[in-house]
Each structure stands twice: as structure tokens, then as C-alpha cells.
């Protein structure tokens, strides 16, 4: 996953 993606 890209480092700038945020996951809940």
C-alpha cells in the first residue's frame, strides 16, 4: 500500500 494512504 502507498505510504500516503490511510486505513481505518
Curated annotation (Swiss-Prot):
GO CC term (a single one): extracellular region
Sequence intervals crossing the membrane: none
Modified residues (4-hydroxyproline): 2
Residue(s) carrying D-4-hydroxyvaline: 6
Tissue expression summary: Expressed by the venom duct.
Annotated compartments: Secreted
D-valine, modified sites: 6
Main location (coarse class): secreted
GO molecular function, one term: toxin activity
Key words, A-Z: D-amino acid, Hydroxylation, Neurotoxin, Secreted, Toxin
Post-translational modification: Occurs in 2 forms which differ in the post-translational modification of Val-6. In the form conophan mus-V, Val-6 is D-valine. In the form gamma-hydroxyconophan mus-V*, Val-6 is D-4-hydroxyvaline. Both diastereomeric forms of D-hydroxyvaline may be produced.
Note: The mature peptide does not contain cysteine residue.
Function: May act as a neurotoxin.
Family: Belongs to the conophan family.
Name of this protein: Conophan mus-V
Organism: Conus mus
